[in-house]
């Protein structure tokens, strides 16, 4: 790689592409490929690549971007038309990380560019090579090449170029045609003009576009008011009287007889419309009075119920008490089981005075046991021979081997309290033995002559 890099000319420009997958630092050969480098730097200064995506990825071959449409068919150069391919004998596609202009055979270079992922010698002399990716940013290019792709070599989630930054500009005479802010302003104005045209069309047609949301800055559409329909006069004939009579009979059973008599009177005599209207009004008043009486009865019933509740001790605002079941507590259940198993001793805490008395009582009993054991040991030492000469109580034989110790064994009559009178005497004291050995060794070494020369011994004595 070092030898390959040394063959390439020195870079004279630097640009950083800030993507969603990390930065990509590109060094440019502006002296060798001036037209392509000027085009690329000016597009970066104008913010032309901001928001564009990497629309094509071929693993182990290349990644391609720079198309504002995101389809691979768009893009334009700063010259207003595609420019020709530029080549140089020292610039060849022999490794990964090389940046070139994307173009077809019939068309020239526009704004699209690609970055190689391996050697592509078939492009030498056919594509414009104008830069290289440097530093650790090459790993961001490799990371982009490992994305998930669809059948058309397009990333499922394409990375986006957030912004571009020109670090070293070789062409000091470049003047951007427009800045990013100016282009955004123009785009907003065009969008506003299109909305205004649509609004004017809707105003002319007299319809409101209900599919479009209305905001505060938009002009309210005029609402066409439809004329109210005038009520046509109702001819109160005998047929309408029969229908009204049926409705009134179903609404109130109390005035059924009155309304039926009126109906028969109207049908037989064919009364005028004024008389019919007067009878209908009387029926309405009766209906209203009957409904009011029912409401009054309901109010009086509720008041009586409230009085009964107050007398019984309850209040009208009091809510029924809902008895909720207690939650199961596993800890209390286990404690109850443990208490029932009689493994726990329940009682009050003892006083300190009683504890001291019990401790002193236990100490005195222990001391008495030690004294009794010492007395028994003394008695055995004084009267042991006499006891052995007496006949045993089991066999009635004096000096019985079964009941007395004749072979240095312990008697069966020993109790657990005999160890209180026992004294431990060490047969061989290790400290005493060590001291004896040291003295013996010192006496043996007295007669051994010293290995040091006499001159050294004399010097030591003089000092």
UniProtKB/Swiss-Prot annotation:
Residues 250-261 have a biased composition (Low complexity). Residues 11-166 form the PPIase cyclophilin-type domain. The lineage of its organism: Eukaryota, Fungi, Dikarya, Ascomycota, Taphrinomycotina. PPIases accelerate the folding of proteins. Catalyzes the cis-trans isomerization of proline imidic peptide bonds in oligopeptides. Involved in pre-mRNA splicing. One of its GO terms (molecular function) is peptidyl-prolyl cis-trans isomerase activity. GO terms for biological process: mRNA processing; protein folding; RNA splicing. Its EC number is 5.2.1.8. This is Peptidylprolyl isomerase cyp7. Belongs to the 40S cdc5-associated complex (or cwf complex), a spliceosome sub-complex reminiscent of a late-stage spliceosome composed of the U2, U5 and U6 snRNAs and at least brr2, cdc5, cwf2/prp3, cwf3/syf1, cwf4/syf3, cwf5/ecm2, spp42/cwf6, cwf7/spf27, cwf8, cwf9, cwf10, cwf11, cwf12, prp45/cwf13, cwf14, cwf15, cwf16, cwf17, cwf18, cwf19, cwf20, cwf21, cwf22, cwf23, cwf24, cwf25, cwf26, cyp7/cwf27, cwf28, cwf29/ist3, lea1, msl1, prp5/cwf1, prp10, prp12/sap130, prp17, prp22, sap61, sap62, sap114, sap145, slu7, smb1, smd1, smd3, smf1, smg1 and syf2. The keyword Transferase does not apply. PROSITE patterns: CSA_PPIASE_1, CSA_PPIASE_2. The gene is cyp7. InterPro entries: Cyclophilin-like_dom_sf, Cyclophilin-type_PPIase_CS, Cyclophilin-type_PPIase_dom, Cyclophilin_A-like. GO terms for cellular component: catalytic step 2 spliceosome; cytoplasm; U2-type spliceosomal complex. Keywords: Cytoplasm, Isomerase, mRNA processing, mRNA splicing, Nucleus, Rotamase, Spliceosome. Belongs to the cyclophilin-type PPIase family. CWC27 subfamily. Residues 224-275 are annotated as: Disordered. It comes from Schizosaccharomyces pombe (strain 972 / ATCC 24843) (Fission yeast). It catalyses: [protein]-peptidylproline (omega=180) = [protein]-peptidylproline (omega=0). It is found in: Cytoplasm; Nucleus.
């Amino acid at each position: 790689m070092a030898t390959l890099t040394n063959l390439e000319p020195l870079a004279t420009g630097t640009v950083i592409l800030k993507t969603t997958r990390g930065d990509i630092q590109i060094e440019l050969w502006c002296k060798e490929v001036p037209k392509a480098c000027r085009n690329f730097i000016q597009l970066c200064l104008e913010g032309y690549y901001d928001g564009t995506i990497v629309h094509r990825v071929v693993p182990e071959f290349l990644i391609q971007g720079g198309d504002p449409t995101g389809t691979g068919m768009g893009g334009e150069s700063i010259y207003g038309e595609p420019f020709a391919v530029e080549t140089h004998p020292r610039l060849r596609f022999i490794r990964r990380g090389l940046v070139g202009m994307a173009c077809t055979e019939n068309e020239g270079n526009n704004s699209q560019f690609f970055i190689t992922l391996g050697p592509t010698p078939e492009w030498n002399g056919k594509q414009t090579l104008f830069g290289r990716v440097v530093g650790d940013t090459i790993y961001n290019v490799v990371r982009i090449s490992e994305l998930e792709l669809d059948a058309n070599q397009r990333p499922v989630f394409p990375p986006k170029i957030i912004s571009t930054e020109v670090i070293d500009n070789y062409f000091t005479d470049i003047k951007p045609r427009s800045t990013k802010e100016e282009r955004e302003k123009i785009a907003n104005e065009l969008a506003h003009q299109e909305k205004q045209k649509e609004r004017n069309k809707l105003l002319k047609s007299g319809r409101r576009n209900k599919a479009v949301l209305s905001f505060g800055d938009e002009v309210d559409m005029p609402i066409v008011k439809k004329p109210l329909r005038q009520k046509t006069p109702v001819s109160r004939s005998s047929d309408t009287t029969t229908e009204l009579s049926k409705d009134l009979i179903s609404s109130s059973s109390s005035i059924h007889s009155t309304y039926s008599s009126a109906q028969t009177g109207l049908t037989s005599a064919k009364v005028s419309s004024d008389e019919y209207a007067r009878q209908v009004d009387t029926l309405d008043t009766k209906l209203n009075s009957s409904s009011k009486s029912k409401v009054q009865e309901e109010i009086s019933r509720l008041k009586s119920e409230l009085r009964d509740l107050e007398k019984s001790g309850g209040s009208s605002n009091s809510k029924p008490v809902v008895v909720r079941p207690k939650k199961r507590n596993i800890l209390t259940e286990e404690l109850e089981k443990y208490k029932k198993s009689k493994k726990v001793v329940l009682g009050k805490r003892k006083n300190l005075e009683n504890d001291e008395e019990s401790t002193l009582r236990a100490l005195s009993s222990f001391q008495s046991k030690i004294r009794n054991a010492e007395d028994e040991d003394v008695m055995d030492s004084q009267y042991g021979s006499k006891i052995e000469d007496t006949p045993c109580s089991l066999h009635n034989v004096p000096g019985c081997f079964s009941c007395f110790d004749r072979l240095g064994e312990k008697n069966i009559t020993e109790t657990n309290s005999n160890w209180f009178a026992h004294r431990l005497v060490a047969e061989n004291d290790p400290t005493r033995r060590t001291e004896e050995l040291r003295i013996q060794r010192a006496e043996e070494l007295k007669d051994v002559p010293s290995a040091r020369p006499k001159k050294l011994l004399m010097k030591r004595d003089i000092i």
